[in-house]
Amino acid sequence: DARESVFVVGNIGTAYTSKSLEMREDSVTVAEISSFQLETIEQFRPKVSAILNITEDHLNRHHTMEEYIRVKELITKNQGPEDVCVLNYEDEVLRKFGENIVPKVVYFSSLRKLDQGIYLDGDQIILKTEKEEIPIVKTGELKILGRHNHENVMAAAAMAYYAGVSVESIHKSVCEFVAVPHRIEYVTEKNGVAYYNDSKGTNPDAAIKGIQAMNRPTLLIGGG
């Protein structure tokens, strides 16, 4: 809603190159970049980047957590001081990483108020800049469940704000956003039982976050 020409590409299933010929000089690209892709970047320089968390994953390729972390942090490799990196304050690895990088760091937290950054205060998500406190949205207005999704909203809102999107557009977008397929995706309700598809929860951390998002007794139906 905030821009005429926006492309959502990358590790979500739409190759960046498949849309490159459609892009204009004023186009905005929202890209999910995998650790596999970050291994070989040379000139890639996002105006706004983010790392949401560091959890054990892809060790069949990276072999150690130290190497996996090193590769994930390459997203800021070419960023300058006028660029922005959004990081999870509650992730100790990312909090320390943010102390020693070139771009402006904006932290998010669902557990505490921050002197600067975006955080959850009661049921209100607030962005605090050097100059003001900006209410973004109340969690009750969101259509997605769970504290981890509140954190996702914080990260997305911060990225959009520092990319020049208005607070009004951010509020409208996060209120309208529904769960992406296979991630705590509402299916139906039968006989008072709500069914959710969370089949993308393929590592322990993702599965735990899905369970924590439920506010009623929960039964898991899993494949083998």
Q: For the regions a protein language model found, what residue spans apply to each?
A:
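Walker A (P-loop) phosphate-binding motif
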Residues: D1-V9
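P-loop NTPase switch/communication element
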Residues: E4, G13-D26
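Short active-site oxyanion
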Residues: S5-V6, D26-S27, G80-C85, G192-Y195, ...
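Cofactor-binding loop segments of dinucleotide-utilizing enzymes, especially the Rossmann-like FAD-
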Residues: N11, S110, G223-G224
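Short acidic loop-to-helix transition motifs that present clustered carboxylates
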Residues: I12-Y16, S35-Q37, E92, A179
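Short glycine/serine/threonine-rich phosphate/pyrophosphate-binding segments
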Residues: T14-T17, I33, N203-A207
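Flexible active-site lid/hinge loop adjacent to a nucleotide/diphosphate
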Residues: E22-L114, Y119-D121, I126, E133, ...
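Nucleotide phosphate-binding/pyrophosphate-handling subdomain across enzymes
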Residues: T139-G224
